[in-house]
Amino acid sequence: MLKNDLIVVVTSVGTEEQALDVAHALVRSRRAACVNIIPNIHSVYRWKGRVCDDGEMLLIIKTLASQFEAVRETIHKVNTYELPEVLGYRVDMASPGFLSWIEKMTALPKRKVAGKAKTKTKAKKAPGKKAAPRRKG
């Protein structure tokens, strides 16, 4: 997988507040271009020896493969689950315009350099003085 490959990351959270926290953290930090929040999903799973049946919210995160680890880390920091689900899927086909938009939205802005760029200039000789002779050899 190339670092500029489009991926979709899927995760689930227990509350709308957590969903918004994850979504805003990812988009603000430019780790994701877009996060869809799908409310009212129902998950049935086995955890610590028992079958659980919970309401959750599903997040669909659009980003680049190069951002996967940062997305995973953000989800683990914000999500309150002991073992958050973080699944990444490569997207095999997408419209070129959408892919270009994802690349722009996840690119970190270029830093502006304070002040002017320094350029080399020839040293000027003091008025009325001759330049020192060059040594040969």
Where are these regions (language model features)?
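Positively charged, small/polar-rich N-terminal and surface patches that mediate targeting and assembly
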Residues: 1-125, 129-137
